[in-house]
Curated annotation (Swiss-Prot):
Positions of the UniProt region annotated as Disordered: 44-77
Protein name: Large ribosomal subunit protein uL4
GO biological process: translation
Keyword Ribonucleoprotein: yes
Source taxon at top rank: Bacteria
Source organism per UniProt: Parabacteroides distasonis (strain ATCC 8503 / DSM 20701 / CIP 104284 / JCM 5825 / NCTC 11152)
Family designation: Belongs to the universal ribosomal protein uL4 family.
Any one of the GO CC terms: ribonucleoprotein complex
Quaternary structure annotation from Swiss-Prot or TrEMBL: Part of the 50S ribosomal subunit.
InterPro entries: Ribosomal_uL4, Ribosomal_uL4-like, Ribosomal_uL4_dom_sf
Length: 209
């Protein structure tokens, strides 16, 4: 698949980039995508949730009413889960949500996500650029020139560039990552994928198998 390379003014440079069909042109595997996104989101969880159970609630252990003869239901102490202020039954406890996923499944998922973008003509290639200073206004202008400003976009750089990153950080609909940070969730969470000319080669090198 060949794509035209644009400059930051949105003009066609006349150069072409050929995307590797083994990465951008495979038959997408939805189940692999599901597993990779599930793992990514699970790994983001802190898992620090905690609620007190019956034995942890502060309160008297005195039996509220006698066992028999009162005419009502049996009742223990004030920490009972059926009473307001009592402990919670089977409440959440701190835990680690991370789980293992095979490298081949991850690779297949990311190739599938990239293939979906290529299939939907949602990939734009821009020549390598940098900025003199972090300017959000300039980043918006570049996005408008490339006709990707209206919807969520993900820009992939070959390596870290703080000037570009800081320029986009304050934008709700824009994200900037490096090619080595590329993941299935980030690709699918964006409507348009903007690759710099050099990042295409880095992405293909990372997924070469």
């Amino acid at each position: 698949m060949e794509l035209s390379v644009f400059n930051i003014k949105g003009e066609d440079t006349g150069r072409k980039v050929t995307l590797n069909d083994a990465i951008f042109g495979i038959e997408p595997n939805d189940h692999a995508i599901y597993l990779d996104v599930k793992q990514y989101l699970a790994n983001q969880r802190q898992g620090t949730h905690k609620s007190k159970e019956r034995s942890e609630v502060s309160g008297s252990t005195r039996k509220l009413i006698r066992q028999k003869g009162g005419g009502g239901a049996r009742r223990g102490d004030i920490n009972s889960p059926v009473l307001v202020g009592g402990g919670r039954v089977f409440g959440p406890k701190p835990r680690d949500y991370e789980f293992k996923l095979n490298k081949k499944v991850k690779s297949l998922a990311r190739k599938s996500a990239l293939s979906y973008k290529a299939k939907n003509n949602a990939i734009v290639v821009v020549e390598d650029f940098t900025m003199e200073a972090p300017k959000t206004k300039e980043f918006i202008t570049i996005a408008k020139n490339l006709k990707v400003a209206d919807k969520k976009l993900l820009m992939v750089l070959p390596e870290k560039n703080n000037l570009v990153y800081l320029s986009a950080r304050n934008l709700e609909k824009a994200s900037v990552i490096t090619a080595s940070e590329l993941n299935t969730y980030a690709v699918l969470n964006a409507v348009n994928l903007v690759l710099t000319e050099s990042s295409v080669a880095v992405v293909e090198q990372n997924f070469k198998a």
